[in-house]
Amino acid sequence: MNFKTVISLFLVLFVSFVYCENGAELLFHKKIVEGPVVGKELPIQFIIYNVGSEPAYDISFIDNDFSNAEFEFVSGSSEGKWETLAPNSQVQTNLTVIPKKSGIYSLTSTVLNYRKTQTSSEFTVSSAASYSGMYVESQADYEKRTSLLIKEWITFFVLCAGAIALPYSISTYYKKNYENGIKK
C-alpha cells in the first residue's frame, strides 16, 4: 500500500470514532412465538435490547394490534414502561391473546419512545421489527395440516406390501419348483 492510502484510511477511522454518537441505542422486536390458530392461545413477546454504551431512560411503548374485538385477551400487557435500561441488557414483556376468527390481519409497527440521556428533553422514536401481516388459521385447517394422516399411512403400507409380496411369492414359487421339480 502506498503512503496516501494508509493516511486516508487512518483519517477515515479517526473521523468515524470522533463523530460516533455515544448514548443509548435501542432495538425493539415484536415476536409472534407460535403460528396463530383460531381458539388457541397466541403468545407475543415484545423485546427491547440496549446495544448502546449508555443507559436509556423513560422507555415506553403501546401496541394496539391485538386490542380489537377479533382477539380475546388472556394475560400479559400490550404496553410497557421502564425508567432505565442498562447498556448491553434487555427487557421483555409478554402478551397472550386468543384469535376468535380466521383471516388475514394487518400488523402495524409498534412505536417505542425513549430518551438517550437523562437530561435530554427530546424523545427518540423507534419502530419494532415486526411482521406486516398475520394469517390466522382456522381450527379445521390446522388439524388437517398437523394430523397424523392415519388413512394415508395405512394405504401406503398396503401398497408397499403388495409391491413386495407379489415378486417374493413368484420368486419363492420358481425356487421351489427348481429345487423339487414340478409335481405331476
Curated annotation (Swiss-Prot):
Per the UniProt entry, the signal peptide is 1-20
Native source organism of the sequence? Dictyostelium discoideum
Would you name any one GO CC term? Answer: phagocytic vesicle
Lineage of source species:
Eukaryota, Amoebozoa, Evosea, Eumycetozoa, Dictyostelia
Q: What name does this protein carry?
A: Translocon-associated protein subunit beta
Q: Which InterPro entries match?
A: TRAP_beta
Q: What does this protein do?
A: TRAP proteins are part of a complex whose function is to bind calcium to the ER membrane and thereby regulate the retention of ER resident proteins.
Q: Which keywords does this Swiss-Prot/TrEMBL entry list?
A: Endoplasmic reticulum, Glycoprotein, Membrane, Signal, Transmembrane, Transmembrane helix
Topology in membrane: Single-pass type I membrane protein
Compartment(s) of residence: Endoplasmic reticulum membrane
Record topology, Lumenal segments: 21-147
Q: Does the keyword Transmembrane apply?
A: yes
Q: Where do transmembrane segments lie in this chain? A: 148-168
